[in-house]
Each structure stands twice: as structure tokens, then as C-alpha cells.
Amino acid sequence: MGGCAGSRRRFSDSEGEETVPEPRLPLLDHQGAHWKNAVGFWLLGLCNNFSYVVMLSAAHDILSHKRTSGNQSHVDPGPTPIPHNSSSRFDCNSVSTAAVLLADILPTLVIKLLAPLGLHLLPYSPRVLVSGICAAGSFVLVAFSHSVGTSLCGVVFASISSGLGEVTFLSLTAFYPRAVISWWSSGTGGAGLLGALSYLGLTQAGLSPQQTLLSMLGIPALLLASYFLLLTSPEAQDPGGEEEAESAARQPLIRTEAPESKPGSSSSLSLRERWTVFKGLLWYIVPLVVVYFAEYFINQGLFELLFFWNTSLSHAQQYRWYQMLYQAGVFASRSSLRCCRIRFTWALALLQCLNLVFLLADVWFGFLPSIYLVFLIILYEGLLGGAAYVNTFHNIALETSDEHREFAMAATCISDTLGISLSGLLALPLHDFLCQLS
């Protein structure tokens, strides 16, 4: 890519005729750097969200915390579970899986709230290193824990890793062509699918949850390798024609912004400029908060209660299947930006709220006759959530100037985390209320 792919210099010979030097090598360099960055951001998205997803997939096991002799923990119950609360019409854990959600999201919320204020002062490399170490620590701590409390501490490490990583890598996209946002989003969707599917598959194959978690320690190493070895230097970026086409169609989010501003550090923005940019972002932040509130209220508040007795799947297995199908929908829609772009993300928020109302009604009245209908609804739920995420960040990338884009990406990160945190806080009392019903 380097500095030679941006423009073709013309030279004049002695007769005044212009000749063009052979562009093939610079073009190949540009294409090679493009694909290295594309793959790099996809892997960063995959590895960054992997531990977060696995902890949510393991939430039922973490809270059940059944043990046998030896060091294997969280043993999968048989296909006919014994209710933890025999007086309730639901098969409830004593603590809602929303507790795992809160441990998995509140540290991320704190990081994202503080990030726009001063995280940019810390270089990217130390942030990535801390993120990788915390991810590895989360797998080890949960795998070897002997209490729910210790396991939740491990979940907190996963939250720190994913939260710090998301703010870091989304801010980093400001120094690369806008196309990397699509690759990052696809990678985060892939983390959901591969994380949930690997946990489901390995436990179904007979591995204990402890062995399954320890087998995933290669993911943090892959994250570090992707950042330090695969990405090209951002100073050498030259977006070329694709960026020019996007800028021509761009509708400025802040009307006074300069259309030709260059990428730069958000540390140069004053507090007044940051507030002005943030107000312009609310059109996208609010619907994303609503989408994530609705879907995680479903995932961590209702999944555990959407239990069907007339199947061969145990309660824990049903929960894992719900998580896997949700993540499959997220992956598909987060990878669809090239063929489907949605500007009005409010529509996605409305549809996700309708999902929440419908499934909450089913938990209360129990009118769905088959678990396979729930499978389809959960897949659809994931499609809506993934589409909201990728289109929100893509729209912001198009509608903010390069000068504001790094700050805008970091500030918008708060949306999903805020929605998830609110859903967890409300899902806890809902769980206690429903589980007391006889």
C-alpha cells in the first residue's frame, strides 16, 4: 500500500511526451494491504467478542455449578432436569442468568463511559495487550473456579477485555478505509456464532465445560497476533476511489463540519466540539440502545424460562441452542452490509420490541406448542440485532467527518452496552417474580 498507491506521477521525456511508470507493483501492494487489513479487522472482531459470547453461552452452567469428583465443573445435567425451585412452574436457577450478563457488561459500560474522556491518551498497543491478557484470564479463572462468585469474577475479566477492545478497535478504524468497519462487524458476528457453536458443540461432544473453556485459550493469542503482526501501518493508508465515492454520497452529521478534513486524533477536539458531535449521534445511539435492551432482555431474562419439557434436550442444552441460533442470526446480518444497507434503524428497534412483547407473552401464557417455533423467532431476533449494529456504525462512518470519526465511533460504543446493562437490571427482578409463580 505505502505511499506509492495514492497517485500516479507523470514524467516527461526529452520530446515533451508524458509517460506513466508501471503501476502494477504499487497496485499489488495496495491490494495486499487492503486484504491484510480486511482479514485483520475480521479476526480482531472475532477474537475481541469471543470470550464475552462464551461466558453468556456458559451462563446456565456457571449458575448451576454442579460438580462431580475431581476437577470437572459445571457438569451438564441429564435430559430430564429436576427443577431448582419445585414450587415454581418454571425450572429456575436460584439466580437469574442476567447476573452473568451484568458481570459480563457492567465493566464494559464503565470503560465505554470513560473512554471518550481520556482513553485516547493511552497508546493503542498497551490497550490491545491488556485486552488479550484479560481474555485469557477469564477462561482460566472460570474454568478452575470453585464457586459462583469466583466464576463471576472471571466473567468480569471477559467484560474488561471485550469492552476495552471494542472501544480501541472501533476508534482505530478512523485511520483505515471505511470498508474495515464492515469486516470488523462481520468478525464480531462471527465471534457470536463460533463462540456459541463451539461451546455447544464441545459440550455436546462430551467435554466438560471446564475442558471446553481451557481449549479456547488460543483465541487471545490470535487477537494479539492479528493486531501486532497482520495489520498494516495506519499512516500509510490511501483509501482511493472507493472512499471518494462514499464521500460524494455522504450526508454530514454535523452541518458545520469540513467535508475534506483529514483523519486525526480525537484528543484535538474541545469539549464543546465533542458535545456537538454527540448530540448529532443521538439519532443513531437511541435506537441501538432500544434494540440491545429488547434483545438482551429476551436472551438473559427469558431464554432460561422458555423451557420445553417435551423434547430430548435438557434445560442447559436448550439454553445453549438458543444462544447459538441468536448468534447465527447476528453473524448473518452483520456480514450483510455489502448487499443490504438500512438507514432508518428505528424500524429495527420497533421490530425488536415486538419480539420482546411476543416472547414475554409466551413465557406468561405458554401458547407456543413447539421449541422449533422459538428457534425461528430467536434466529430472527439475532438478524435484527446484527443489522442494527452494523448499519449504525456504517451510517456514522459515512456521516461524520474524518476529524470527528474516531471520537464518534468511541462514543457510539456506549449504545449497545447501555441497552444490555438496562436489560440485565430489569431481568433480575423479572426472574425472581416469575420463578415465584406456582
Swiss-Prot record:
Protein name (Swiss-Prot/TrEMBL): Battenin
- Domain commentary: The C-terminal (153-438) mediates KCNIP3 interaction and the cytoprotective activity. the dileucine motif mediates AP1G1 and AP3D1 interaction.
- Cysteine methyl ester carried by residues: C435
Q: Could you tell me which Gene3D superfamilies the record lists for this protein? A: MFS general substrate transporter like domains
Query: What disease is associated with this protein?
Result: Ceroid lipofuscinosis, neuronal, 3: A form of neuronal ceroid lipofuscinosis. Neuronal ceroid lipofuscinoses are progressive neurodegenerative, lysosomal storage diseases characterized by intracellular accumulation of autofluorescent liposomal material, and clinically by seizures, dementia, visual loss, and/or cerebral atrophy.
Keyword list, A-Z:
Cell membrane, Cytoplasmic vesicle, Disease variant, Endosome, Glycoprotein, Golgi apparatus, Lipoprotein, Lysosome, Membrane, Methylation, Neurodegeneration, Neuronal ceroid lipofuscinosis, Phosphoprotein, Prenylation, Synapse, Synaptosome, Transmembrane, Transmembrane helix, Transport
Topology class, membrane: Multi-pass membrane protein
UniProt region (Disordered), positions on chain: 1-25, 237-268
Source organism per entry reads: Homo sapiens
Family affiliation: Belongs to the battenin family.
| Lumenal domain ranges by topology | 59-127, 173-182, 299-346
